[in-house]
C-alpha cells in the first residue's frame, strides 16, 4: 500500500500518484499505473472543479494507463486533460503557474516498471537535478544496467534523489522467485489438473481487477484456451491481451471475481456460477497468487504449496524483493533515497537505517563534481635555427651535461651603439649614443655548438664578390701583412660541400712580432674562441661609409656583404659552468699572443668617436665574465 504523499522535494509543483489535499495546487499530475492506492483523489469533486476552469493542468501517463483509466466512466472527465507519453522518449514539459505566469521546464522520461500493464517510472531532469520516481516496480537483478536512459554515455546519470517502492524491502523477503519461475510452477499445476477431463476446472483467485495479465496471456498461449473474466471493457484497446480473455463461461480456466453483495452457492465455487452443460458436477481447484504468505515462511518451500484438498497458494509478486531493490539502488547510487511504502511491521526509522548504506555518501562512490574545462594554453614558440626536419624535434633526450643558455645576437643579447651621421652640428650630438641590451632568455636546447646562418646561393656569392672589390682598393700600410690565408679560405669554402665546424669557429694562428701585438691590442677586442663568449659588436657610421668590427671567427669566413645582414639570427651558447669562468683569465693572457690575420689588418680599425672613451680591457673583461656566467648585464653609457 503506497504511503507516498505525492510531492517531491526537488520539484514541488508536480504531484505523482496522489490527487488530494495540497496536491490540488500542483501545476501538473503524473499517474504511474491504475491501482487504487495510487489514484486517491483522482475522481474527487475538488480536482474535477479545478480542471473545469484550468487551461494548463494536464495528467501525464502511459498510453496503456490512459486506456485503462478512460475505460471506467467515472474518470471520463479527464479525457481532455490526459497527455499520454511514449516509453523511453524524453519529453520537455513546461510547468506553468496560472496565477503568476511563472514557468519551469523539465524533461521527463517514462521507463518500464514491470509492475502491471502500463506501469512506468518517471525520470525528471531539470534545474533542480535528476530525480527518479519508481511508483510500484518489479525489476530483476541487473535490469537497471540495461536501461539506456538511466545512463549518460557509458556512465550512470548523476541522480539526486530516488523515490522508490519499498513494499518488500525487508530481509525476510530477501529473495522472491522470478516471475518466470512462478509461472512455470503454476503452468505445471494447471496442466496436471485440466488434462484429466473437461470437468476439471481451475480458478485463479486474483484480488485485483487487473495486474495479472501476465498470467492470463501466458496460460492462454500454453493451453490454447481463453481465460474467463467479468468484463472486457478495460482490454478493448489492448489487443495483445484481449485475444486471451473472454466472457464465455464454458472454459476450463477462470479468473472471474465475486460480485459485491451477492451470495453464491457453496456447492459451486466459481464466482460466475458456471456448471457443466450435462449437469455433471465440476471438479474445481483454486490457485491464489501470493507473496506475503511466502515471506512469513521460515523454511524453504516450492513456488506452489497445497493448502487444502482443493486450494493452492502460488508465489507471484508484483514488487521487487529486498535483494532486487538493493541491487537497483547500488547500481544507480543516488544522493538521497526516500521510501514510498512502509512494509508491514516496519517504521520509517527502520527503513531509513536500511536505506542509508545505499546512499552515495555511504556506498563508497565519490560525488560527481562538474568542472569547467578552463582556459586553453597557447603553445610556446621555439626560437631555433634548426630546420623543421631536425631530429631534435622528433626525439627528446635527457642531457647529462650542465644546462646552457642559448643567446641570439639579434634577438636575445646584443649591445649596439647607434651614432648619428656627421653633419654641421655633429659636435653637439657627439654624446647621443646609447647601448641597447636585450634581456637574456634561457633556451630549452642543450646542444653544445654555435649556430651560424649562411647562404649558399649563387646570387649571394656574386654580391659578396662585388662588395669585396671596393673594400680591397685601399693599399695596405707598410706595417700590415696581406691576408693571403683569408682569401684562400673563402675560395675553398665555396668548393667544399661539407665544411667542418672548426673552419667556421677556429681562427688560424698567425705569429707576429711583439710590436705588432702591442699595436693591435689597444684597438681590437678578444676573439670569441679565446673568451668562450662573443664580445659586443660596435656599429658606427662615419662619412656615409659603413665599416664593421667583427670577431675573428666571423671575419674568417663572412665577407663585408654579410655584415649588412647581421639582423639574421647568429646564436652563441653561454655555458653556466663555473669551470669556464675560472679559465677566463688564462685564456685572456693567451689572446695577447694569438691573433688571426683579420685582427692584424688595419682595414678594420675604427677611429674613436670624438668625446668618447675607449673601453679599458678591465671593463671588457668584467663584461665578458658576466656574459660567460649568464649573469644580467646592466646597460650603461660610455662617455
Swiss-Prot record:
Residues 450-496, 515-570, 590-617 are annotated as: Disordered. One of its GO terms (cellular component) is nonhomologous end joining complex. Residues 454-466 have a biased composition (Acidic residues). Residues 548-560 have a biased composition (Low complexity). One of its GO terms (biological process) is telomere maintenance. The keyword Nucleus applies. Its main location: nucleus. It is an enzyme of class 3 (hydrolase). Residues 518-537 have a biased composition (Polar residues). GO terms for molecular function: 5'-3' DNA exonuclease activity; damaged DNA binding; endonuclease activity. It is found in: Nucleus. Its EC number is 3.1.-.-. Keywords: DNA damage, DNA recombination, DNA repair, Endonuclease, Exonuclease, Hydrolase, Nuclease, Nucleus. May have a role in the processing of DNA double strand breaks (DSBs) prior to their repair by the non homologous end joining (NHEJ) pathway. Probably exhibits both exonuclease and endonuclease activity. Belongs to the DNA repair metallo-beta-lactamase (DRMBL) family. This is Protein artemis. It comes from Danio rerio (Zebrafish). The gene is dclre1c.
Amino acid at each position: 500500500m503506497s504511503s507516498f504523499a505525492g510531492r517531491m522535494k526537488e520539484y514541488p509543483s508536480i504531484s505523482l500518484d496522489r490527487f488530494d489535499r495540497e496536491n490540488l495546487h500542483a501545476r501538473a499530475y503524473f499517474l504511474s499505473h491504475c491501482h487504487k492506492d495510487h489514484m486517491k483523489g483522482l475522481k474527487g469533486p475538488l480536482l474535477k472543479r479545478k480542471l473545469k476552469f484550468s487551461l494548463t493542468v494536464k495528467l501525464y501517463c502511459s498510453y496503456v494507463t490512459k486506456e485503462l483509466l478512460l475505460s471506467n466512466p467515472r474518470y471520463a472527465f479527464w479525457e481532455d486533460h490526459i497527455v499520454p507519453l511514449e516509453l523511453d522518449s524524453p519529453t520537455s514539459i513546461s510547468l506553468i503557474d496560472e496565477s503568476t505566469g511563472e514557468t519551469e521546464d523539465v524533461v521527463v522520461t517514462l521507463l518500464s516498471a514491470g509492475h502491471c500493464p502500463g506501469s512506468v517510472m518517471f525520470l525528471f531532469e531539470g534545474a533542480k537535478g535528476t530525480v527518479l520516481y519508481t511508483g510500484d516496480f518489479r525489476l530483476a537483478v541487473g535490469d537497471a544496467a540495461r536501461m539506456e536512459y538511466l545512463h549518460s554515455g557509458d556512465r550512470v546519470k548523476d541522480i539526486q534523489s530516488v523515490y522508490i517502492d519499498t513494499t518488500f524491502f525487508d530481509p525476510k523477503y530477501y529473495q522472491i522467485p522470478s516471475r518466470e519461475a512462478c509461472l512455470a510452477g503454476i503452468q505445471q499445476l494447471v496442466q496436471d489438473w485440466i488434462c484429466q477431463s473437461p470437468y476439471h476446472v481451475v480458478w485463479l483467485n486474483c484480488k485485483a481487477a487487473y495486474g495479472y495479465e501476465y498470467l492470463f496471456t501466458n496460460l492462454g498461449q500454453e493451453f490454447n484456451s481463453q481465460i474467463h473474466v467479468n468484463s472486457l471493457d478495460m482490454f478493448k484497446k489492448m489487443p495483445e491481451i484481449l485475444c486471451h480473455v473472454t466472457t464465455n463461461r464454458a472454459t476450463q480456466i477462470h479468473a472471474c471475481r465475486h460480485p459485491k453483495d451477492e451470495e453464491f452457492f457453496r456447492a459451486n465455487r466459481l464466482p460466475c456460477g458456471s456448471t457443466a452443460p450435462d449437469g455433471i458436477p465440476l471438479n474445481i481447484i483454486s490457485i491464489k497468487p501470493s507473496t506475503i504468505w511466502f515471506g512469513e515462511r521460515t523454511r524453504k518451500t516450492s513456488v506452489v504449496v497445497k493448502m487444502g484438498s482443493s486450494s493452492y497458494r502460488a508465489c507471484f509478486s508484483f514488487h521487487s524483493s529486498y535483494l532486487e531493490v538493493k541491487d537497483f539502488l547500488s547500481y544507480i547510487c543516488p544522493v538521497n533515497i526516500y521510501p514510498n511504502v512502509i512494509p508491514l511491521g516496519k517504521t520509517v526509522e527502520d527503513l531509513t537505517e536500511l536505506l542509508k548504506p545505499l546512499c552515495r555518501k555511504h556506498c563508497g562512490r565519490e560525488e560527481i563534481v562538474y568542472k569547467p574545462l578552463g582556459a586553453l594554453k597557447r603553445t610556446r614558440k621555439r626560437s631555433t635555427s634548426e630546420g623543421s626536419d631536425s631530429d631534435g624535434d622528433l626525439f627528446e633526450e635527457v642531457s647529462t651535461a650542465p644546462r646552457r643558455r642559448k643567446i641570439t645576437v639579434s634577438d636575445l643579447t646584443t649591445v649596439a651603439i647607434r651614432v648619428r651621421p656627421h653633419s654641421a652640428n655633429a659636435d653637439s650630438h657627439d654624446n647621443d649614443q646609447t647601448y641597447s641590451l636585450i634581456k637574456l632568455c634561457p633556451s630549452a636546447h642543450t646542444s653544445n655548438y654555435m649556430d651560424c646562418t649562411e647562404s649558399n646561393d649563387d646570387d649571394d656569392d656574386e654580391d659578396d664578390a662585388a662588395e669585396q672589390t671596393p673594400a680591397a682598393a685601399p693599399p695596405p700600410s707598410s706595417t700590415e701583412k696581406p691576408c693571403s690565408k683569408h682569401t684562400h679560405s673563402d675560395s675553398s669554402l665555396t668548393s667544399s660541400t661539407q665544411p667542418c665546424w672548426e673552419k667556421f669557429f677556429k681562427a688560424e694562428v698567425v705569429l707576429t712580432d711583439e710590436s705588432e701585438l702591442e699595436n693591435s691590442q689597444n684597438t681590437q677586442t678578444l676573439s670569441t674562441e679565446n673568451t668562450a663568449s662573443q664580445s659586443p659588436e660596435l656599429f658606427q657610421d662615419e662619412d656615409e661609409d659603413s665599416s664593421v668590427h667583427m670577431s675573428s671567427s666571423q671575419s674568417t669566413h663572412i665577407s663585408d656583404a654579410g655584415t649588412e645582414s647581421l639582423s639574421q639570427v647568429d646564436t652563441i651558447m653561454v655555458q653556466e659552468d663555473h669551470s669556464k669562468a675560472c679559465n677566463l683569465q688564462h685564456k685572456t693572457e693567451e689572446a695577447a699572443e694569438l691573433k688571426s690575420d683579420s685582427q692584424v689588418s688595419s682595414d678594420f680599425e675604427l677611429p674613436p668617436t670624438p668625446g668618447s672613451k675607449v673601453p679599458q680591457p678591465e671593463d671588457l673583461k668584467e663584461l665578458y665574465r658576466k656574459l660567460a656566467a649568464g649573469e644580467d648585464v646592466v646597460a650603461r653609457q660610455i662617455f
